[in-house]
Amino acid sequence: MRFFPVLLLIPVMSAAANYSIKRGVVDGVEVVQLADAAHRTEVTIVPSLGNLGYEMKVNGKNVFWTGKPLGELREKPSQCGNPFLAPWANRLDREAFYANGKKYLLNVDLGNVGRDGNRNPIHGLLTFSPLWKVVKEEADEGSARVTSRLEFWRYPDLMAQFPFAHTIEMTYRLAGGRLEVETALENHSMEPMPVAIGFHPYFRVHDAPRDKWKVHLAAREHLVLSRLLMPTGERKPVTFPDPVSLAGTQLDDVFSGLEPNAEFWVQGERERVSVIYGPKYTVAVVYAPTGRDFICFEPMSAVTNAFNLAHAGIYKDLQMVPPGGVWRESFWIASSGF
């Protein structure tokens, strides 16, 4: 990927320092790049495309699967890299959701609600949002980091769909060769705000074909899904082998009962990519379709269709942010053998 600096180039530290941060333009799109020289790691973030983590290169190899050049992605957005899903992740089972005992209808005429193959709402409202603003860029002896903010409450088309005034801050922090993604939700509303956000990162290893990849699932419970990929409320013990071979295996599964500091990973011959979940990411979706050279380990704060399942009494673990409160959690991406 070619990197062209623009007039605003931010060398936050001396040239001898390990961590650095700079802004630039790639394929006509403004980006922020974090670098960890000691671990030969560079991370590229695209604030104007949903604050997307687009690349995490280790020794020149991308840990993320990106699918297309950044200029093409801007013209025709599609899932890749590290997309953020909010205010709900994955699917809803209807064009409405419940919160605090009240039913809220989605206005599909506003054009900001995506749909899955069964015409159900999917992945929230912000996946490729241009509304993110960079508010802080720092690099020192400990890390390189950038924080972006989206003031959800300012935008009527968003509030019409999810009427909880809140602000989202997301920090990408590169330290010790690991990328931390920290998300904070501040609830400005007078009522508790339900939390069902998540991320849908796409990963790959380069030193083996997909059929040679091995996968570790750091969970105890496997959620039973309907034909529409909605949880039924039934949970079964995980019976996959450890590790799982992706040879002839397709995954589009939801897991709970995560191990402490749950670490999901995929490995080729030597290369390994791990995702470590903070404790408030209580659910993992794992997506690995056959015939595609990627796998997704998706940190989720709730199960699919959580708002409606909680209202029905099926899902008991929906997290809430009290009025004036803040929900905050991180997950980490690490690599080895690259």
Describe the residue ranges of each PLM region.
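Beta-strand-rich N-terminal accessory domains
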Residues: 17-112, 260-281, 325-338
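Intrinsically disordered, low-complexity Pro/Gly/Ser/Thr-rich segments with frequent PxxP/GP/PP motifs
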Residues: 314-327
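Sec-dependent N-terminal signal peptides
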Residues: 3-13
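Active-site/ligand-binding surface loops and adjacent short beta/alpha elements
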Residues: 111, 192-194, 202-278
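Short, conserved secondary-structure segments in the cores of folded domains
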Residues: 93-94, 158, 317
